[in-house]
């Protein structure tokens, strides 16, 4: 099994070498400070300035995607699957527990890195783990840390799979991770099987370390990221390949279905067990930015723009070189000319047919600024990030209705991609976190809850039974982002209609409009039924009391002759 899994990882990784090189070129351009580290270095221009247009588009996309995915503190809700789960107690317990774990586990920080992968490579991969963190003090006291589900980023370069399968959840997957020898030593203290394998691994490292020459090993032992097998064995890192899916075991002539198999050093199987997830498939998730036909690897928003970035840098440095030649042109010397000093006021003695002049390049190339501007504008549109989304207004006067229609049309690609990330990626991840908690939770959890009516915060205990109910977690950040803009625009029109047309306004509920406004601005304490009446009465009461006090004070002063 170890050799089979190692060979599959090596084979699947080799099939995507071209894809890996393309992503490296994109990364080079995004983080470049000059053209010397990009493919533009082959142009041969004296200037090597890079215009970071691809970087600006990347930053713009990332900022807008994150604003769309997380427009508010709570960006998901629990949808009950039956009457029992729909009870207020059950639904509130699940919602409160997941809100607490998303907040405590650094979910947003991890998603931030996943959005990076999604934009730069066109693919994001993640899995879910259950963490039990604790710290032991010098006095032996155990301090409990985070206990709950976490989302774990998988680098697009550390996962290999068969991209020809119709759906990602059905394809076998191999995830590569690196562990330290210290982590294995700690596990070996309580696991005899790990201790035995660790002993063999240390022996191999000792033999290779003293061999002094190039040890011939099978391809299954070669670890990615190390220059040689000797360097790998002499390091303190251990490579782990974790296989998810179905595999044929040649040693027993049986097919292992839905297994989780871990291989170390591409030689030792340290874990071989049924997939523990209740979801029925591996808890490894993927989303692509742009789908390819018959290929699970997605295409990124920057893939088609690298050539245009190359063109911008080419024109910019060509223009700079020409400008340098105009400012300091090449000197042309013809015929017999005595040596001279090239300086203001110098005299040049020419022989017969002698001549001195300048070779001035054609200044038409300086008009490249217009071409560069057009290319940059085109790149914005092709990336699905219109200039208006950056705060720049397109030319021309527009009515409010035209502005709304243009905004919706301009952001349609952007909203579609953000909703896809949310539906295909975040939703299964959140549900896998809930499934992991239902399976692994063994203690009571204290979580905070917010009263929607008053905004007050209170705490309650949540048990494993409380969160074990039929239902799903549904994120709605990206969908809320687009819907909220439309709702606020509509509310403004309704409020104006209610004020300007009393005959129509009497049929609109002011109470409902007030509730919606309080919800949209995320201030639950802003709303209270007939609160203005109570506040007016309270203000009037205070004013009346103050008037009585003032009258009594003046009467007392008059009686005292003051």
Task: For each feature predicted by the language model, list its residue ranges.
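Conserved core architecture of multi-subunit DNA-directed RNA polymerases
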Residues: 49-54, 58, 116-117
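Short, hydrophobic/amphipathic alpha-helical patches that form generic packing surfaces
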Residues: 59-67, 96, 100, 121, ...
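Helix-loop-helix transmembrane hairpins and adjacent membrane-interface loops
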Residues: 74-78, 126
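Terpene synthase/cyclase
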Residues: 40-48, 59, 246-250, 272, ...
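Generic detection of long, well-ordered alpha-helical segments
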Residues: 51, 84-91, 104-108, 298-309, ...
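Extended, regular secondary-structure scaffolds
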Residues: 89-306
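C-terminal anchoring/interaction modules
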Residues: 1-49, 111, 118, 126, ...
């Amino acid at each position: 099994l170890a050799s089979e899994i190692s060979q599959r990882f090596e084979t699947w990784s080799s099939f995507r070498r071209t894809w890996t090189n393309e992503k490296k070129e994109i990364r080079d351009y995004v983080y470049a400070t000059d053209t010397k580290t990009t493919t533009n270095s082959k142009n041969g221009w004296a200037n090597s300035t890079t215009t970071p247009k691809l970087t600006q588009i990347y930053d713009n996309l990332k900022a807008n995607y994150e604003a769309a995915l997380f427009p508010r503190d709570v960006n998901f809700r629990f949808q009950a699957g039956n009457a029992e789960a729909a009870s207020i107690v059950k639904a509130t317990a699940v919602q409160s527990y997941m809100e607490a774990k998303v907040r405590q586990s650094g979910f947003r920080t991890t998603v931030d890195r996943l959005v990076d992968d999604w934009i730069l490579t066109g693919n994001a991969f993640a899995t879910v783990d259950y963490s039990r963190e604790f710290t032991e003090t010098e006095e032996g006291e155990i301090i409990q840390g985070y206990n709950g589900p976490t989302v774990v980023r998988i680098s697009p370069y550390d996962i290999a799979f068969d991209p020809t399968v119709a759906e990602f959840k059905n394809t076998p997957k191999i995830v590569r991770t690196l562990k330290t020898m210290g982590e294995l030593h700690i596990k070996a203290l309580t696991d005899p099987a790990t201790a035995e394998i660790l002993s063999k691994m240390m022996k191999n490292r000792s033999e290779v370390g003293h061999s002094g020459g190039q040890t011939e090993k099978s391809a299954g032992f070669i670890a990615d990221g190390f220059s040689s097998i000797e360097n790998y064995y002499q390091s303190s890192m251990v490579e782990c390949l974790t296989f998810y899916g179905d595999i044929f075991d040649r040693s027993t002539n049986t097919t292992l279905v839905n297994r989780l198999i871990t291989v170390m050093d591409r030689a030792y199987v340290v874990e071989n067990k049924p997939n523990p997830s209740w979801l029925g498939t591996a808890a490894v998730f993927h989303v692509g930015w742009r789908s390819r036909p018959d290929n699970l690897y997605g295409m990124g928003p920057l893939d088609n723009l690298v050539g245009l970035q190359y063109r911008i840098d080419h024109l910019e440095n060509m223009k700079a070189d020409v400008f340098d030649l105009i400012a300091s042109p090449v000197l042309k010397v013809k015929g017999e000319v005595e040596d001279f000093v090239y300086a203001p006021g110098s005299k040049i003695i020419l022989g017969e047919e002698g001549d001195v002049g300048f070779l001035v390049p054609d200044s038409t190339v300086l008009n490249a600024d217009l071409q560069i501007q057009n290319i940059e504008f085109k790149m914005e549109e092709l990336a699905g990030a219109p200039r208006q989304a950056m705060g720049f207004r397109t030319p021309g006067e527009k009515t409010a209705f035209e502005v709304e229609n243009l905004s919706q049309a301009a952001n349609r690609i952007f909203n579609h991609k953000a909703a896809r990330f949310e539906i295909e990626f975040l939703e299964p991840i959140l549900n896998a976190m809930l499934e992991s908690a239902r399976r692994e939770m063994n203690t009571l959890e204290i979580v905070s809850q917010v009263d929607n009516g008053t905004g007050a915060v209170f705490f309650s205990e949540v048990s494993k039974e409380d969160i074990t109910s039929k239902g799903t977690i549904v994120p709605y950040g990206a969908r809320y982002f687009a819907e909220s803009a439309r709702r606020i625009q509509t509310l403004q029109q309704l409020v104006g209609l209610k004020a300007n047309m009393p005959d129509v306004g009497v049929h609109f509920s002011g109470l409902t409009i007030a509730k919606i406004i309080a919800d949209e601005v995320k201030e639950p304490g802003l709303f209270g039924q007939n609160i203005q009446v109570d506040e007016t009465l309270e203000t009037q009461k205070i004013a009346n009391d103050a008037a009585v006090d003032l009258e009594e004070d003046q009467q007392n002063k008059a009686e005292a002759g003051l």
